[in-house]
């Protein structure tokens, strides 16, 4: 089974390491035909205890020039209902403390169409409120009635979970016009290739049932390669 690429045009929602929480691994690529249990390690690297909520969710992809061509794609590719996490809530994770969270992915039903499916594990850390002493008042601030307050913030993180069912089949069309390259992926599997524009190269990944339009300066020489084989060339 091919490995999935965890970011779509640099805009897929990759897991983040920030001031409160470290998460490993940062993505999962799982087999659709087998029920599996995986481990996730979370670590609180802030200076105060946090409460951590974890749950499987689906998130739509939004990017400039990207359109999903399947109106029901949310239902088509969403596997959040096949994922369970334990524990779903860690009531207190102390500074520098690590905990193991287990992800259970159930095998997809045999009658589900071949294709690629995805969901995300949503991690929501919230700093736990703590009492402030009188010595803290100058550093932490005071409210209008003289009582101490502390402003806490949290940043959600997302770990992608990908599943591929069946043998990959490609159904992609290319169009060059009006200074734009348009790639339409009508298949149920993601499309990936190397995009060359003049002297610049980048990895391009397009999700299933999606169309992407990218604009370039007039006269740009554009080519798409996959496994060193030319897929399409044009001059805009």
What is each model feature region?
Residues 72-110, 198-223:
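Intrinsically disordered, low-complexity Pro/Gly/Ser/Thr-rich segments with frequent PxxP/GP/PP motifs
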Residues 24, 33-39, 99-100, 112-120, ...:
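Short, solvent-exposed loop/turn segments enriched in Ser/Thr/Gly
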Residues 170-236:
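Intrinsically disordered, low-complexity segments enriched in serine, threonine, and glycine
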Residues 46-48, 109, 127, 184-189:
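Short, acidic/polar linear motifs in exposed loop/turn regions
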Residues 19-50, 90, 169-176, 184:
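Beta-sheet-dominated interaction scaffolds and their linkers
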